[in-house]
Amino acid sequence: MAKVCEICGKGPITGNNVSHAHNKTRRRWLPNLKKVRMVTASGATVRGKVCTRCIRSGAVVKPA
């Protein structure tokens, strides 16, 4: 699925833009996804979309 982290499942969330006059229009906050090469549990190298929190926390094992 597009715009979803393949490790943790984090996806878009919705809310409102609020102007100075308090007019509200719908908007989406998107996760900070990066395309990275990673090693799976079986040892294969695959490319996937992963959020930066998973990359920083070490949940992604990068190939040597």
From Swiss-Prot:
Q: Name one GO cellular component term.
A: ribonucleoprotein complex
Q: Which Gene3D superfamilies match?
A: 2.20.150.30, Ribosomal protein L28/L24 (2.30.170.40)
> Which keywords does this chain's UniProt record carry?
Ribonucleoprotein, Ribosomal protein
Q: Name one Pfam family in it.
A: Ribosomal_L28
The yes or no answer to whether the keyword Acyltransferase is present is no
Q: Which GO terms describe its molecular function?
A: structural constituent of ribosome
Tree of life domain? Bacteria
Q: Which GO terms describe its biological process?
A: translation
Keyword Ribosomal protein assigned to the entry: answer is: yes
- InterPro entries assigned: Bacterial_rp_bL28, Ribosomal_bL28, Ribosomal_bL28/bL31-like_sf, Ribosomal_bL28_bact-type, Ribosomal_bL28_sf
Transmembrane segment boundaries: none
The family classification in the record reads: Belongs to the bacterial ribosomal protein bL28 family.
Q: What is this protein called?
A: Large ribosomal subunit protein bL28
This chain's source organism reads Desulfotalea psychrophila (strain LSv54 / DSM 12343)
Q: Which gene encodes it?
A: rpmB
